[in-house]
């Protein structure tokens, strides 16, 4: 689950990470009032969407008067902001953050992610803040410093100081940088975040260390123990299909293709999408019905896929381990009838009760295209989507 910048800064503030004073605004009038409350002479008007690259897209403006705050708030609120992370369709801006200006002397970068290989937390830091870390990694990889943190020990003072110096923090500001880094780590750990990023972490002219931005992503499987994080959820920023899928415990992600995919198991789902692409097709979604799929879940999965007008064919690829093929077949038949299926349907089943499942499909009277291998299924569904 993602949250907005101003919400991320609320979290950082709780963990003693210095952030600028700022007030969220949902209208132009609220933006003006926020600016007046903060006082000048400089304010930053920031679009609040769940995507990076807002500055380059015109979603961050520096205002030097209340009139400019009004002007920028009017132009940003309601705009469709397109960045490299939103895709060409962009995101509608419904919230702003009005923030006091900062005296930026140097911009730094710091982030935390889970390193699954080492089973530790990876801290990445760079002296090249304020830009995409991917660009830094490509052009100046030597400027990215990585530290693996033992979760049982946490981020130690000496480690934080060493990283701070490596990214160019002067000695006089190292204690402040240590506080910011350790606060970020503690916030990351205690909220079950999967990513926490400050870009940029700035040094001001008088040597202060301040988090000028905040990005958090949380492990959805851990949200049950963080109601305070769930309260930050903004459904307007999420795909309506993915919200609907979550109601039925379906793992669904919208994609840009025209072939709907219904698979049990995340690994098999990814392999299925890869195979579709290998045969020249484009998946319209990732959809994992899990190991406990019921007729209701399969029916809802079909409804979700068919709400996408771009879907021209559907591939059901099932491995019957925990899930029996006859149960899936029953669900597929019921779902196809319930939604009056109007696009070609390719089904491939392997595993428990495979023969029974195939017989049920064959006897259903539905125009189902059968396949024995994943390659055959992918080839057939790509052809069907192309109208061949």
UniProtKB/Swiss-Prot annotation:
DNA-binding keyword on record: no
- Which InterPro entries has this protein been placed in? ATP-grasp, ATP-grasp_succ-CoA_synth-type, ATP_grasp_subdomain_1, Succ-CoA_synthase_bsu_CS, SUCC_ACL_C, Succ_CoA_ligase-like_bsu, Succinyl-CoA_synth-like
Residues forming the ATP-grasp domain are: 9-244
Q: Which sites bind Mg(2+)?
A: 199, 213
Q: What is its EC number?
A: 6.2.1.5
Q: Which reaction does it catalyse?
A: succinate + ATP + CoA = succinyl-CoA + ADP + phosphate; GTP + succinate + CoA = succinyl-CoA + GDP + phosphate
Q: Which residues bind ATP?
A: 46, 53-55, 99, 102, 107
Family assignment from sequence similarity: Belongs to the succinate/malate CoA ligase beta subunit family.
Q: What does this protein do?
A: Succinyl-CoA synthetase functions in the citric acid cycle (TCA), coupling the hydrolysis of succinyl-CoA to the synthesis of either ATP or GTP and thus represents the only step of substrate-level phosphorylation in the TCA. The beta subunit provides nucleotide specificity of the enzyme and binds the substrate succinate, while the binding sites for coenzyme A and phosphate are found in the alpha subunit.
The name this protein carries in UniProt is Succinate--CoA ligase [ADP-forming] subunit beta
> What's the encoding gene here?
sucC
């Amino acid at each position: 689950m993602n949250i907005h910048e101003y919400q991320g800064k609320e979290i950082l503030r709780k963990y003693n990470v210095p952030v600028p004073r700022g007030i969220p605004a949902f209208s132009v009038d609220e933006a003006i009032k926020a600016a007046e409350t903060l006082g000048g002479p400089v304010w930053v008007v920031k679009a609040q969407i769940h995507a990076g690259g807002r500055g380059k897209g015109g979603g961050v403006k520096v205002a030097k008067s209340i009139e400019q705050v009004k002007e920028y708030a009017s132009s940003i609120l309601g705009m469709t902001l397109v960045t490299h992370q939103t895709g060409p369709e962009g995101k509608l801006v419904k919230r702003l953050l009005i923030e006091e200006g900062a005296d930026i002397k140097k911009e730094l970068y710091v982030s935390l992610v889970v390193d699954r290989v080492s089973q530790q937390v990876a801290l990445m830091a760079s002296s090249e803040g304020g830009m995409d870390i991917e660009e830094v990694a490509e052009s100046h990889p030597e400027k990215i410093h990585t530290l693996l943190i033992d979760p049982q020990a946490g981020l130690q003072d000496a480690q934080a100081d060493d990283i701070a110096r490596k990214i160019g923090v002067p000695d006089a500001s190292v204690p402040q940088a240590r506080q910011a880094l350790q606060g970020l780590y503690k916030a990351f750990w205690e909220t079950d975040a999967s990513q926490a990023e400050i870009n940029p972490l700035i040094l001001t002219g008088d040597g202060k260390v301040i988090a000028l931005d905040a990005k958090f992503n949380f492990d959805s499987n851990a949200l049950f123990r963080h109601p305070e994080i769930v309260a930050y959820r903004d459904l307007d920023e999420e795909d309506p299909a993915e919200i609907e899928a979550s109601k039925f415990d379906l793992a669904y992600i919208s994609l840009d293709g025209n072939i709907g995919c219904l698979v049990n198991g995340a690994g098999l789902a990814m392999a299925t999408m890869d195979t579709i692409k290998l045969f020249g097709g484009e998946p319209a979604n990732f959809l994992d019905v899990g190991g406990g799929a019921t007729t209701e879940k399969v029916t809802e999965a079909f409804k979700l896929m068919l709400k996408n007008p771009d879907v021209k064919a559907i591939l059901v690829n099932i491995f019957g381990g925990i899930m029996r093929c006859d149960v899936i077949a029953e669900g597929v038949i019921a779902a196809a009838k319930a939604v009056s299926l109007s696009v070609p349907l390719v089904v491939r089943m392997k595993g428990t009760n495979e023969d029974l499942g195939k017989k049920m499909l064959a006897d259903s009277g539905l125009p189902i295209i059968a396949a024995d291998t994943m390659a055959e299924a992918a080839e057939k569904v790509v052809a069907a989507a192309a109208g061949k």
